[in-house]
């Protein structure tokens, strides 16, 4: 049965490769997607690197192996390209935790504040924001803004982390990533007892009490880089557990322990090779943003990319 599945995946992969050439398409995949999807992708990265790749790519078609807000960001930045989301139901619960209405109310309460919006948000919310950020560049973005007050949406944990690295007043909203929010300090304590020499690399979407245990607090791409340059040979990885497989392949001489077997983003796992093939065959499901929203949202994303050195 396993050989049959492998053969089927190979046939699907061959067909995808053929269609990619015909349509001048590339596949962009997030670190949290399935292993077979990442293996076949043209580029694998976190939100910031995927944004950059979408802008710089010469492809006519971008197949986004990720969730809706990621494909939306690619479409905002590159409207001349067809951006396909293989599974339209692949959403991000955190992105839905802030709406245009709630953001406008926050702006009324804090009229002197600039709005810094995590990219894990809708195009409409980005359009209401002054600048976007990712977990890679949130501190730099906030410190680049002239305003002394910041409305930070939607992730309260990332916002709390940023507040430790700025003298600006940060107004937070109660949004969170369920994957990171569900990581508890008891998970860390258990693994630290089992692997006392291991470095704990935590994502800033984790709760503050979890981050307090961390040796380093880093974005997903930052975790990958730190695992390669550190003198340590053992690591506890405080983010979605899929990244552990990538780390093991990249650094086979090192040991990696997922902080929790429950740290799974099921929306990312919805994307399969079959759904990518269907997407390329039928040119679906194309993500488009209304121009009046796209133009405003693009300004916020462009400002972020200029701060990030893109």
From Swiss-Prot:
Could you say which enzyme class this protein belongs to?
Answer: transferase
The entry marks the following residues as binding iminosuccinate, namely 30, 47, 118-120, 135, 203-205, 220
Keyword line: 4Fe-4S, Cytoplasm, Iron, Iron-sulfur, Metal-binding, Pyridine nucleotide biosynthesis, Transferase
Where in or outside the cell is it found? Cytoplasm
Q: Which domain of life is it from?
A: Archaea
Under which EC number(s) is this enzyme classified?
2.5.1.72
| Principal cellular location given in the protein's record | cytoplasm
Q: Does the keyword Signal apply?
A: no
Q: List the Pfam families.
A: NadA
Query: Binding of [4Fe-4S] cluster: at which residues?
Result: 92, 177, 265
GO MF entries:
4 iron, 4 sulfur cluster binding; metal ion binding; quinolinate synthetase A activity
Q: In which pathway does it act?
A: Cofactor biosynthesis; NAD(+) biosynthesis; quinolinate from iminoaspartate: step 1/1
The entry's free-text remark on the cofactor is: Binds 1 [4Fe-4S] cluster per subunit.
Any single biological process term in GO: 'de novo' NAD biosynthetic process from L-aspartate
- Provide the cofactor list for this protein: [4Fe-4S] cluster
Question: In this UniProt entry, which cysteines form S-S bonds?
Answer: none
- Swiss-Prot/TrEMBL catalytic activity: iminosuccinate + dihydroxyacetone phosphate = quinolinate + phosphate + 2 H2O + H(+)
A GO CC annotation given for this chain: cytoplasm
What this chain does, per the record? Catalyzes the condensation of iminoaspartate with dihydroxyacetone phosphate to form quinolinate.
According to its UniProt record, which protein family does this protein belong to?
Belongs to the quinolinate synthase family. Type 2 subfamily.
NCBIfam families noted in UniProt? nadA (TIGR00550), PRK09375.1-2 (NF006878)
Which protein, by its recorded name, is this?
Quinolinate synthase 2
Organism field: Methanosarcina acetivorans (strain ATCC 35395 / DSM 2834 / JCM 12185 / C2A)
Name of the gene this protein is made from: nadA2
